Swiss-Prot record:
It comes from Lactobacillus gasseri (strain ATCC 33323 / DSM 20243 / BCRC 14619 / CIP 102991 / JCM 1131 / KCTC 3163 / NCIMB 11718 / NCTC 13722 / AM63). GO terms for molecular function: FAD binding; UDP-N-acetylmuramate dehydrogenase activity. This is UDP-N-acetylenolpyruvoylglucosamine reductase. The keyword Transmembrane helix does not apply. Pathway: Cell wall biogenesis; peptidoglycan biosynthesis. Its EC number is 1.3.1.98.
Amino acid sequence: MKMQLMDLKKQGIDIQENIPLSRFTFTKTGGPAQYLAFPKNLDELKILVETVKTNNLPLTVIGNASNLIIRDGGISGLVLILTKMDKIVANQEEATVTADAGARIIDTSEAACEASLSGLEFAAGIPGSVGGAVFMNAGAYGGETEFVIKSVRVLTREGKFKTYTHDEMEFGYRHSLVQETGDIVISATFGLEPGDKWAIKAKMEYFNGLRRAKQPLEYPSCGSVFKRPTGHFVGPMIIKAGLQGKRIGGAEDSKKHAGFIVNVGGATATDYLDLIHLIQKTIKKDFDVDLQTEVRIIGKEKD
């Protein structure tokens, strides 16, 4: 298997071995990828998917790794990072923006603004990729990815291209169909509304101002860790439980925004997960509320 993957490297595909994924995650934590590839186009992506399928090798796809915790043992098999696939095309006449999965959702919202198209303002400060935003149904400030998705193009694990309509994506709170199917998002088309460019820009700047004021952007983090339980707010519960500012190793529940766990220096994924579990256990005991993680947690424990 190693020989086959390295042969792909000779063909010009960027593929590496035993690379620490902490280099790519927003938390600056995570163990190594057994193999790591950065496909530049659909042809390379298809070759990689077919190679791992033929050899029965595990396949993991990540985007900008902004809402992701990778355990300290890393990930076996092949990890694909799609950030080199980042084309964005705005069509003012059709009021759409189509973006590759590896494009940043921030850049996609800015492209919409430049084309005087409204609907993606909420995404102006979300640090993830388009693929990640679709996968997680990312949202902020009353906006959700599902509100503006027109269609999603994917590559199935069998190596077939397929397009889903909005309704076929089965969006829910931080959920989409591709979480169940394992399909790889390769692009998304957003259906937007014509608007005033300067009003759109002002709204984006307003949301970014709120983000800077309320979120601990000065530290590495994976953003909001927990889903909001029905009838409750996570931050106030954490504060009432006395856990704001709680630190395990280098992971700390942010003093600026309870519910954000930041890397204040030298944190490991285990530190993050231990703090998450402590918060979940305490909130269950104090409030009888089961906190579910919003952040995606993957990989294996360190031996």
